[in-house]
Swiss-Prot record:
Domain of life: Bacteria
Name of the protein this chain belongs to: Large ribosomal subunit protein uL30
InterPro entries: Ribo_uL30_ferredoxin-like_sf (IPR036919), Ribosomal_uL30_bac-type (IPR005996), Ribosomal_uL30_ferredoxin-like (IPR016082)
Quaternary structure annotation from Swiss-Prot or TrEMBL: Part of the 50S ribosomal subunit.
One protein family per Pfam: Ribosomal_L30
Organism: Corynebacterium glutamicum (strain ATCC 13032 / DSM 20300 / JCM 1318 / BCRC 11384 / CCUG 27702 / LMG 3730 / NBRC 12168 / NCIMB 10025 / NRRL B-2784 / 534)
GO cellular component: cytosolic large ribosomal subunit
Gene (UniProt): rpmD
A single GO molecular function term of this UniProt record: structural constituent of ribosome
Gene Ontology biological process terms from the UniProt entry: translation
Keywords for the protein's UniProt record, in alphabetical order: Ribonucleoprotein, Ribosomal protein
Family membership: Belongs to the universal ribosomal protein uL30 family.
Gene3D superfamilies attached to this UniProt entry: Ribosomal protein L30, ferredoxin-like fold domain (3.30.1390.20)
Length: 61
């Protein structure tokens, strides 16, 4: 299973760690979407920035 992650809010005024997590997920701007594998590491990054993103489950790798 994979996760479709879309950034819905900007990073102005956020903590540096949150910006690092978004960059590690591959998100660069608002409405940018990436597909990442469903792993504990990715879930941890998602948990830290859940107020800035939307996550959907998709079939696939």
């Amino acid at each position: 299973m994979a996760l479709k992650i879309t950034q819905i809010k900007g990073t102005v005024g956020t903590k540096p760690k949150h910006r690092e997590n978004l960059r590690s997920l591959g998100l660069k701007r608002i409405r940018h979407t990436v597909i990442r594998p469903d792993t504990p590491e990715v879930r941890g990054m998602i948990l830290a920035v859940r107020h800035l993103i939307v996550v959907e489950e998709v079939a696939g790798e």
